[in-house]
Amino acid sequence: MTLNGGSGASGSRGAGGRERDRRRGSTPWGPAPPLHRRSMPVDERDLQAALAPGSLATTAAGTRTQGQRLDWPEGSSDSLSSGGSGSEEGVYKVLLLGAPGVGKSALARIFGGIEDGPEAEAAGHTYDRSITVDGEEASLLVYDIWEEDGGCWLPGHCMAMGDAYVIVYSITDKGSFEKASELRVQLRRARQTDDVPIILVGNKSDLVRSREVSVDEGRACAVVFDCKFIETSAALHHNVQALFEGVVRQIRLRRDSKEDNARRQAGTRRRESLGKKAKRFLGRIVARNSRKMAFRAKSKSCHDLSVL
């Protein structure tokens, strides 16, 4: 499995190709850095070695031709990261997974601010962007992952490196929906002990007449596999901003939840009283008898990316 795009093409480009690599950015920090096009690393250390020191947050994002900047709608604060602007610890790695042709690359390019066209392929397929969500800035490093012919779907290093996973299918392709379910199973097996955000995305929601996967099917799948759900349209840019902002919120919610749980456990190590034990036991019985109600409640919240 590799990131879309290869490194061999850069050496054969002439002066025109090198000029495209130095396309003028539209941010106040000056020109964007040169493109980084590379294969999927064996592990995360190889990825870090492939980049210049301090440049983990300065990959292909922000590289575009003049007039092709695709901003979030007005009212959302965002900026493209400049060289060395963020530390490695402050970057969230997000992997886009899914069958070929479901629109992963289109979603990634919208996030990176790059418009589809003849120049789009030159921009690489790893995108970095800093966005402000709920008044707090976050840097996302988005990988557009694709399957090589005869390759396995998700190698171990891919499973281990993500801070969040976005599994994309097309609502017009039932097979891609089934493949998305397979990917979710693989992730669950690989990271059973990790509470990693996984978001199921039904793309191409604008193609209503060609729909093969209903909203209810997508939502039910998300509930069964314990992940979030959203439908998007890359063609109309519908819900794309909500998707990536939701990724940030899900990462933060899990981070904050772990910190709260640690504090709670540290402060409640004293022995429980008999009344508390009885209450906890009764709570378990009620929970067993309320599975259907819990399933309904979960199905109502699985599309809300602002809650766990």
From Swiss-Prot:
Main location as per UniProt: membrane
Phenotype reported upon loss of the gene: Mice show increased susceptibility to thoracic transverse aortic constriction (TAC)-induced cardiac hypertrophy. TAC-induced CAMKII phosphorylation in the heart is also significantly increased.
Region Calmodulin-binding, annotated ranges: 278-297
Effect of S273A: Reduces amplitude of peak Ca(2+) current induced in ventricular and atrial cardiomyocytes by nonselective beta-adrenoreceptor agonist isoproterenol; however, basal electrophysiological properties of Ca(2+) channels did not differ
Outcome recorded upon mutating S105A: Loss of interaction with CACNB2. QT prolongation and ventricular arrhythmias, caused by the augmentation of L-type Ca(2+) channels in the heart
Segments of this protein annotated with the region Disordered: 1-86
SUPFAM superfamilies attached to this UniProt entry: P-loop containing nucleoside triphosphate hydrolases
Quaternary organization: Interacts with Calmodulin preferentially in the inactive, GDP-bound form. Interacts with CAMK2D. Interacts with CACNB2; interaction may be involved in beta-adrenergic regulation of heart rate and contractile force. Interaction with CACNB2 regulates the trafficking of CACNA1C to the cell membrane.
UniProt similarity note: Belongs to the small GTPase superfamily. RGK family.
Protein name as it appears in the record: GTP-binding protein RAD
The gene coding this protein: Rrad
